[in-house]
């Protein structure tokens, strides 16, 4: 789950990490009220969407007067914005964050994440903040520093001070940096987060460090014990079909292609998409119907796939281990009848009760195309889509 900047800053502040004073507003007049409550300007007005790159898209404005604040908020609120991170999708701006604006002396980068390669919680820091860290890694990798945290020892103050001096901080600032690292480690673990990225972590004209922007990503598997985070979810920032799928407990991700996929098992689903690509097709989605799939679940999966008008064909690829192929076949037949599927459907079944499942499909009298294996199925669905065009 992703979070808005104002939510990320709220969590950072709760854990003693300094952030500029600020508050969200839903109308231009509210934005002016917030600005006045923060004292004399200048202020920053920032569009709240689940994406980075807002500045380049016009979603971050420096304001010297309350008239500027009102104008900036009016221009953003009620509109939609796309950035280089949204893949062409426009996200609604329902809130703006109004904060104090100090003069930036230096921008740093700091993040904490789980490094699956080293199997540790890892910090990444750089003296080059305010830009994409991928760009820094490509152009000046020597400016990036990493720390793999020992689970027994945890992060200590000396780790942070050492990092701070590597980034060119003075003694006072290195001490602040160490405190931020220790508090960030506590936040990361206690909230079951997968990523926290502070970019930039800035030195302002008062000589102190502040988190000017924060990107959070939580571990959805821990949602049952993170009620505060779950309450922060903003479904207006998410793909509608993905929201519906999550409510049905179906793993679904929208993609840009035209061939819908229904598969049981995440690994098989990814392999299916790869084979479709290798055969010249483009997957329209990732959909793992799950090992405990039943007839109704298959029907709901078809509805999710066909909710996109981009879908011109469907490949059902099922390996029946826990799930029975005959039950999947019953679900496919029921779905085709109930949903009124008008695009080619290719089905590959293998595993438990496979012959019974295939017989049900044959006896249905429906124009369902059988496939012998994953490659055969991918070829057939790509060909069927081309022939139907």
Curated annotation (Swiss-Prot):
GO terms for biological process: succinyl-CoA metabolic process; tricarboxylic acid cycle. SUPFAM superfamilies: Glutathione synthetase ATP-binding domain-like (SSF56059), Succinyl-CoA synthetase domains (SSF52210). Mg(2+) binds at residues 199, 213. It catalyses: succinate + ATP + CoA = succinyl-CoA + ADP + phosphate; GTP + succinate + CoA = succinyl-CoA + GDP + phosphate. The keyword Phosphoprotein does not apply. Its EC number is 6.2.1.5. Residues 9-244 form the ATP-grasp domain. Keywords: ATP-binding, Ligase, Magnesium, Metal-binding, Nucleotide-binding, Tricarboxylic acid cycle. Pathway: Carbohydrate metabolism; tricarboxylic acid cycle; succinate from succinyl-CoA (ligase route): step 1/1. GO terms for molecular function: ATP binding; magnesium ion binding; succinate-CoA ligase (ADP-forming) activity; succinate-CoA ligase (GDP-forming) activity. It comes from the Bacteria. Binds 1 Mg(2+) ion per subunit. ATP binds at residues 46, 53-55, 102, 107. Its cofactor is Mg(2+). Substrate binds at residues 264, 321-323. Heterotetramer of two alpha and two beta subunits. NCBIfam families: PRK00696.1, sucCoAbeta. Succinyl-CoA synthetase functions in the citric acid cycle (TCA), coupling the hydrolysis of succinyl-CoA to the synthesis of either ATP or GTP and thus represents the only step of substrate-level phosphorylation in the TCA. The beta subunit provides nucleotide specificity of the enzyme and binds the substrate succinate, while the binding sites for coenzyme A and phosphate are found in the alpha subunit. Belongs to the succinate/malate CoA ligase beta subunit family. This is Succinate--CoA ligase [ADP-forming] subunit beta. It comes from Xanthomonas euvesicatoria pv. vesicatoria (strain 85-10) (Xanthomonas campestris pv. vesicatoria).
